[in-house]
């Protein structure tokens, strides 16, 4: 489990096509400290497994389904990525519960800067819209954010300077893809309510 609090901006140093998968080598001095084979690291919100680890770099294999459902397929050598290690039992939950299972992708639609923050509008797949509410949580490229406005096919978030400086969202431009993970609690509530309604018939 992750919290959506990005630990560092990493960098893609190599991409190898394996046919039905891709192998990424990524640099991240913070997240690789003490890393072991089989550990999980979230890369732009996607939970990946460490295959190899050497120095401040690690490699991870990404299956075709993950490449299809996320924006990882758009990464190339030199791309910056948000990195986070799983949260430890008993540690603070600084953001919200993030599984690292991307629900879909959106696109940055617009950026509106102001004196102290920036409003970013992101497109939202129709099948995810019901899980996104104003003041609720959403994960964008692995970053736990609070929804400012929820529309039928978009939402907006407000980014403070720290988020702009320390994550990829400070660099994303209109048209760039982002990974989206909706709040898992909303999905559980929907499933529970569906079961209750079915039992009452």
PLM feature spans:
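Conserved loop->alpha-helix
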Residues: 1-201
């Amino acid at each position: 489990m992750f919290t959506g609090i990005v630990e560092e901006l990493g960098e893609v140093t190599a991409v190898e096509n394996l046919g039905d998968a891709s192998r990424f080598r990524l640099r991240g001095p913070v997240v690789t400290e003490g890393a072991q084979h089989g550990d999980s690291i979230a890369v732009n919100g996607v939970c990946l497994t460490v295959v190899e680890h050497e120095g401040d770099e690690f490699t991870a294999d990404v299956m075709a389904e993950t490449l299809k459902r996320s924006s990882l397929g758009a990464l190339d050598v030199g791309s910056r990525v948000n990195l986070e290690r799983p949260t430890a039992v008993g540690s603070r939950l600084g953001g919200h519960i993030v599984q690292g299972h991307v629900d879909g992708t959106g696109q940055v639609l617009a950026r509106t800067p102001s004196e102290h923050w920036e409003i970013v509008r992101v497109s939202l797949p129709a099948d995810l819209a019901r899980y996104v509410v104003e003041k609720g949580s959403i994960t964008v490229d692995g970053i736990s954010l609070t929804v400012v406005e929820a529309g039928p096919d978009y939402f907006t978030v407000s980014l403070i300077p720290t988020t702009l400086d320390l994550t990829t969202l400070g660099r994303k431009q209109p048209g760039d893809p982002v990974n989206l993970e909706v709040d898992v609690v909303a999905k559980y509530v929907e499933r529970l309510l569906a079961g209750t309604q079915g039992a009452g018939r």
